[in-house]
């Protein structure tokens, strides 16, 4: 009985909010709060916190390339309104998107399996 696993959205501000609640949730409720990046070791792939930048653009290129229209992106970085992170034209690629997706899934599956074993032992 009781809550054993809570899954939440893990992007940007929500990840930070989960991290801020971590200690209190563990003390008050015995609940472990883990983010998608709790288990990540590769620093280059660990913090994927951009908005329409190279990270998100690369993921879309890997999954739905027909949605990408670089004609809408200005080369001048000072005019990239609404973009945070690496430059979407110069730093994005389908290969990087696939690398991000594969690493994320591998890391999450491994981490969740490890945590699930701990939960079962409680």
Residue ranges and their predicted role:
Residues 1-122:
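Extended, histidine- and acidic-residue-enriched regions that form the cofactor-binding/catalytic faces
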